[in-house]
Design a protein with these regions (language model features):
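Conserved AMP-binding/adenylate-forming
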Residues: 1-35
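Conserved S/T- and glycine-rich ATP-binding loop of Class I adenylate-forming
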Residues: 4, 21, 52, 124, ...
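Conserved AMP-binding
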Residues: 8-11, 32, 41, 170-174
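Conserved short alpha-helical elements in the N-terminal third of ANL/AMP-binding
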Residues: 19-24, 173-181
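Structural core segment of the AMP-binding/adenylate-forming
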Residues: 23-100
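Conserved pre-ATP/AMP-binding loop-to-beta segment of ANL
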Residues: 94-129, 136, 159-165
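Conserved structural elements of the adenylate-forming
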Residues: 121, 140-161, 166-169, 179
């Protein structure tokens, strides 16, 4: 499936982009925000990502001409389109999105209007890149079953109990942060 990369600090919009990607049925490619621009270029290109959600400050340090496979780049601050490949109509689509939503859902968008893509849990849903201490990062393909196994482990070992509080400093793009936060 299509791959969608996400890079930025932990925040609600990062989670929205991540969850929207996997519930759409695409493969999410989380990238650690402290990777240098050269590593980010490599990961986006190597993963064959077609969209990138990024913080504005990270985008300011990337070279769009090195990201030729991307169809578009979106800001994690407000989801506006920061860049689109020539010939794409994403900005035009976004300008009319509110009108389209009002026309399609005249009574408003409700919970029952949500329909998730049905995918087998053995399909790759996450392409997580290592820190690359011995060269460029390597992509690790994880399926729904891999992630469900982490949740099952946490439940069986009573990793957390009702009422527990957690202070996590790991980025959501980190393998552990992504699996357990």
């Amino acid at each position: 499936g299509d791959k969608i990369a996400v890079i930025g600090k932990n925040n609600s919009r990062w989670c929205i982009a991540y969850m929207a990607t996997i519930t759409y049925g695409a493969i999410v490619v989380p990238i650690l925000q402290d990777f240098n621009p050269n590593d980010v270029h490599h990961i986006v290109t190597h993963s064959e990502s077609v969209f990138l959600f990024t913080s504005d400050s990270i985008w300011d340090h990337l070279e769009e001409e090195r990201l030729t496979g991307l169809r578009a780049v979106f800001s994690l601050s407000d989801f506006r389109c920061l860049h689109q490949r020539d010939g794409e109509t994403i900005n035009r689509f976004l300008k009319h999105l509110d009108d389209e939503m009002h026309e399609t859902y005249p009574k408003g968008f409700r919970r029952e209007d949500v329909q998730y893509t049905t995918l087998s849990n053995d399909k790759v849903m996450l392409l997580n890149y290592t820190s690359g201490t011995t060269g460029f990062s390597k992509g690790v393909m994880l399926t729904g079953n891999n992630l469900a196994g982490n949740v099952t482990f946490g439940i069986r070992t009573e990793l957390l109990k009702k009422g527990d509080k957690v202070l996590s400093f790991l980025p959501l793009a980190h393998a552990y942060g992504c699996a357990f936060d």
